[in-house]
């Protein structure tokens, strides 16, 4: 008994020591940040990785095949349910948290580049604060993101699809749900996003323009509320349609997965709740709900395939008012 207690105590001390060292490394990376721009992105990546355990990425051949099968099945089921044609990235990545940080440092840097273009010299203290904020945001997200379809906005490469395996494992355990079914559900959600961008070749450019306008306005000290509103409406359509088609296409029970995941979000500690609000995670949940209600009403009136008309051309996107009045959207889009 004493030996077991001693082992647990030693493991606890070792873990706390490791956490302390990692925290020191994260703080040191921020304080050592350099350059002239508003954010030292190299330091952001270093600090976020230091403050975040990478997680285990030891997968059996069966587990790797499970990811591949889930993605392939999701593609076929969503094509059939939604009546849209789309392709997936050539390779699906299964990542740990550090891999996700590395990929998204590049994304954040790309999206926020207008800030660097307009702000040539930044005081060291402000740069350290900006760097710390970005590192905290990425570290928090790296511990929570389960999967991600990346259309590579503002980039030149191919679209990407990846899953953060340690987070899927951890969430399935915390929620007390079957891991394989949970992983499959996440795959269907991310593939649903791939379907949207495949069905709407104009969508990446629209989002890029919205993001560039919003960030440029912020860099100039202003806030283009109309641009932000348009971006929010577009993202509400993106999130809502994905919810509709993943629910219609998924081949297993999922109500308990959604309920438990929502409970997990709502039951977070105060620091987590604050970060979710600052990062707009709560807004994304509202986008899910509002967008899904809109598309459910459209599907009920005319079928799931009719909802795909939203991606035929930019003008078919619902307005902010139409999101709460699906009949008005149906009358406008199908008046012919």
Q: Which role does the model predict for each range below?
A:
Residues 190-207:
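Catalytic Zn2+-binding segment of zinc metalloproteases
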Residues 240-336:
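Pan-zinc metallopeptidase signature
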Residues 70-166:
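Auxiliary, metal-adjacent structural segments of Zn-dependent hydrolase domains
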Residues 169-186:
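Short pre-active-site segment immediately N-terminal to the catalytic Zn-binding motif
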Residues 1-103, 180, 306-336:
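N-terminal low-structure segments adjacent to metalloprotease catalytic domains
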Residues 77, 194, 198, 245:
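Short alpha-helical functional segments enriched in proximate histidine and acidic residues
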Residues 205-242:
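Acidic/histidine-rich catalytic neighborhood
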Residues 60-61, 225-233, 278-284:
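Active-site rim elements
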């Amino acid at each position: 008994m004493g030996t077991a207690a001693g082992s647990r105590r030693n493991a606890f001390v070792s873990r706390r020591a490791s956490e302390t060292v990692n925290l020191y490394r994260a703080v040191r990376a921020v304080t050592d940040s350099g350059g002239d721009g508003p954010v030292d992105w190299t330091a952001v990546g270093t600090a976020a990785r230091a403050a975040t355990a990478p997680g285990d990425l030891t997968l059996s051949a069966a587990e790797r095949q499970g990811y591949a099968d889930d993605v392939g099945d999701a593609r076929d089921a969503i094509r059939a349910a939604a009546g849209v044609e789309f392709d997936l990235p050539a390779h699906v990545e299964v990542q740990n948290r550090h891999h996700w940080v590395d990929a998204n440092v590049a994304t954040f840097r790309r999206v926020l580049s207008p800030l660097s273009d307009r702000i040539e010299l930044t005081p060291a203290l402000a740069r350290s604060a900006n760097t710390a904020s970005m590192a905290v945001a990425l570290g928090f997200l790296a511990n929570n993101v389960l999967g991600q379809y990346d259309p590579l906005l503002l980039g030149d490469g191919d679209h990407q699809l990846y899953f953060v395996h340690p987070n899927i494992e951890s969430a399935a355990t915390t929620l007390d749900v079957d891991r394989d079914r949970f992983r499959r559900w996440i795959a269907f959600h991310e593939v649903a996003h791939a379907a949207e961008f495949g069905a709407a070749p104009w969508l990446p450019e629209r989002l890029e323009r919205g993001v560039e306008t919003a960030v440029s306005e912020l860099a100039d000290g202003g806030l283009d509320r109309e641009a932000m509103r348009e971006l929010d409406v577009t993202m509400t359509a993106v999130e809502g349609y994905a919810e509709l088609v993943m629910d219609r296409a998924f081949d297993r029970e999922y109500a308990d997965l959604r309920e438990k995941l929502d409970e997990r979000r709502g039951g977070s500690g105060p620091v987590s709740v604050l970060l979710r609000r600052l990062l707009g995670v709560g807004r994304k949940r509202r986008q899910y709900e509002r967008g899904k209600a809109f598309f459910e009403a459209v599907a009920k009136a005319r079928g799931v395939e009719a909802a795909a008309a939203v991606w035929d051309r930019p003008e078919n996107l619902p307005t902010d008012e139409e999101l709460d009045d699906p009949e008005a959207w149906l009358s406008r889009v199908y008046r012919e």
